[in-house]
Amino acid sequence: MNCARLHQRIPLRAMALTTTSYPALAPSHSFANASTSVMTASAMAVAHRAAATTGASDATTTAQVVHYSKLGMDGFTDIKFNTAADELLELVETKVDALDSAAVEDVSCNGGVLTLETTERGTFILNKQAPNVQLWLSSPISGPHHYDMITVTQDGHEKVSWKSDHDGHDLVKKLEKELTEVLGTAFKL
């Protein structure tokens, strides 16, 4: 293939990758028209899981599932992400502090990083990754995980959840399961 043809293909491939991975960045002349929108298969799967985990049905849920980490900066506000992330970090810290369990050596939350040191299983670290619009979990039980911020608008109320970018599992359920195992008592957020 000559250089001229290669240079013509590179922008088209870049546009195709950008459009399928980040639909909000798609130019107006791209693969979407006014009546349809482009959504990746993984974003579609996350949207379905988000609707399913909130108990939403088509009748009660607006078609407003926002997968922030796939949108680039479109629709993103620092306040919305930071508020949701800080609320979850503070909730985990408060609930663990309230348990007064011998299995917990120390729990602290500073600068968007929650550290939970256990006596026997190791350290859990949950931290904000604002540039990626994600929360990252380092677990001594299951290893590292990245969670995307998902919002679902249902009956006029917005609900935030955190879904794994790998397999779509829910962060809160993962924490409840693993902390119940480590602490030896039921842990609910």
Swiss-Prot record:
<dbReference type="InterPro" id="IPR002908">
    <property type="entry name" value="Frataxin/CyaY"/>
</dbReference>
<comment type="subunit">
    <text>Interacts with IscU; the interaction is direct.</text>
</comment>
<dbReference type="GO" id="GO:0004322">
    <property type="term" value="F:ferroxidase activity"/>
</dbReference>
<dbReference type="GO" id="GO:0005739">
    <property type="term" value="C:mitochondrion"/>
</dbReference>
<dbReference type="InterPro" id="IPR017789">
    <property type="entry name" value="Frataxin"/>
</dbReference>
<dbReference type="GO" id="GO:0008198">
    <property type="term" value="F:ferrous iron binding"/>
</dbReference>
<comment type="similarity">
    <text>Belongs to the frataxin family.</text>
</comment>
<keyword id="KW-0410">Iron transport</keyword>
<keyword id="KW-0409">Iron storage</keyword>
<dbReference type="InterPro" id="IPR020895">
    <property type="entry name" value="Frataxin_CS"/>
</dbReference>
<keyword id="KW-0813">Transport</keyword>
<dbReference type="GO" id="GO:0006826">
    <property type="term" value="P:iron ion transport"/>
</dbReference>
<dbReference type="GO" id="GO:0051537">
    <property type="term" value="F:2 iron, 2 sulfur cluster binding"/>
</dbReference>
<feature type="transit peptide" description="Mitochondrion">
    <location>
        <begin position="1"/>
        <end position="50"/>
    </location>
</feature>
<comment type="function">
    <text>Iron-binding protein which binds 2 iron atoms per monomer. Probably, acts as an iron carrier for the biosynthesis of Fe-S clusters. Stimulates the cysteine desulphurase activity of IscS in the presence of IscU.</text>
</comment>
<dbReference type="GO" id="GO:0016226">
    <property type="term" value="P:iron-sulfur cluster assembly"/>
</dbReference>
<dbReference type="Pfam" id="PF01491">
    <property type="entry name" value="Frataxin_Cyay"/>
</dbReference>
<keyword id="KW-0496">Mitochondrion</keyword>
<protein>
    <recommendedName>
        <fullName>Frataxin-like protein, mitochondrial</fullName>
        <ecNumber>1.16.3.1</ecNumber>
    </recommendedName>
</protein>
<keyword id="KW-0408">Iron</keyword>
<keyword id="KW-0560">Oxidoreductase</keyword>
<dbReference type="GO" id="GO:0034986">
    <property type="term" value="F:iron chaperone activity"/>
</dbReference>
<keyword id="KW-0809">Transit peptide</keyword>
<keyword id="KW-0406">Ion transport</keyword>
<dbReference type="InterPro" id="IPR036524">
    <property type="entry name" value="Frataxin/CyaY_sf"/>
</dbReference>
<dbReference type="GO" id="GO:0006879">
    <property type="term" value="P:intracellular iron ion homeostasis"/>
</dbReference>
<dbReference type="GO" id="GO:0008199">
    <property type="term" value="F:ferric iron binding"/>
</dbReference>
